[in-house]
Amino acid sequence: LNQFVSHLVQREDALFSNLATRTNGNYDKKVKKRLQDLPDQFSYEKLEEIATAEAKVKTNNNDLGISNHFYNTRLKMKLKKLKGFQKNESYVQSPEYNDLQLVLDQFAKSRTNVIFVIPPVNAKWMKYTGLSQEKYEQAVQKIRYQLESQGFTNIADFSKDGDQPYFMEDTIHMGWNGWLAFDKAVNPFVTKAEKAPTYHLNDRFFSKDWAQYKGTPDEFK
């Protein structure tokens, strides 16, 4: 398990090592020149105006609320073939629920206070591809039950926001106003000190029964 977690950390380091900081060239190229676009005084309302204005320009070549770049490079040429392709898709049954439990187990052992973010799916994309809203919400409830029943109660759940204007950048990733909502939800968690949590793990979440369970989560035995 420790080896697994070490691997996760290495992957995380690799992922974030190129992010812009004041000590590398990316700061000047990717951050400094954009600072002039920000309001002089911090304001979510003003930031939302800026985000919305930018999003309108960058999503103006399609009806899905998806960035022009993503649409042009990933969807445009095959869009017709993708219509209805997710009508039989479901995330309710998956071995990844067991994988999640492995991560929770390590967090509990280290008494790490964490916040989980549940992103939405682009509602227009969901409708176009036929992805079941009911099954999607069922998967979200299953995830939430696995977390909350074991004491992982810090959850930023945006699963119902996939239809909000300019909330998404593509099919499944949050965009302009989505990141503002993310900041509002996560900022209190990272800025306020909290006591180390106490978790109550249930090893039944490691079982194949749970991975394949389709019923009401709190009725799982």
Task: Name the predicted role of every residue range.
Residues 10, 94, 122, 163-167:
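Alpha-helix initiation/capping motif
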Residues 69-77, 112-121, 158:
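A glycine-rich, aromatic-flanked flexible loop/lid motif
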Residues 82-86, 123-126, 155:
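A generic short-segment signal for beta-strand/edge and adjacent turn/coil regions
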Residues 90, 94, 130, 173:
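Charge-dense, low-complexity intrinsically disordered segments
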Residues 101-115, 143-154:
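A structural motif corresponding to the C-terminal end of an alpha-helix
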Residues 132-135, 139-221:
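C-terminal regions of proteins
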